[in-house]
Amino acid sequence: MPSVRSVTCCCLLWMMLSVQLVTPGSPGTAQLSGHRTARSPGSTICKMACRTGNGHKYPFCNCRGKRDVVSSSMAV
């Protein structure tokens, strides 16, 4: 029977790899066209984080140069 530590390690590794594979705009990562539903929550989180100025808290979000929908100003 696998130990709790090894199961936890495998789950964390799987989550890190799956996030890296479906992060849009990241250089060198695979863009899997069949996984649009997996990308949607991440892009929604990034849009909200960039809009509220909290994009720096999420390393997978790229907020530079995106227009702020509310004020039409450039987000930093």
Swiss-Prot record:
Q: What is its main location?
A: secreted
- Signal peptide annotation: 1-24
Question: MF terms per GO, please?
Answer: acetylcholine receptor inhibitor activity; potassium channel regulator activity; toxin activity
Q: Which residues carry this modification: Arginine amide?
A: 64
Q: Kindly list the cysteine pairs connected by disulfide bridges.
A: 46-61, 50-63
Q: Name one GO cellular component term.
A: host cell postsynaptic membrane
For this UniProt entry, which segments traverse the membrane?
none
What's written under domain?
Answer: The cysteine framework is XIV (C-C-C-C).
Recorded family membership: Belongs to the conotoxin J superfamily.
Q: What does this protein do?
A: Highly inhibits both nicotinic acetylcholine receptors (neuronal (alpha-3/beta-4) and muscular (alpha-1/beta-1/epsilon/delta) subtypes) and the voltage-gated potassium channel Kv1.6/KCNA6 subtype.
- Its protein name is Alpha/kappa-conotoxin-like fe14.1
Query: Which source organism?
Result: Conus ferrugineus (Cone snail)
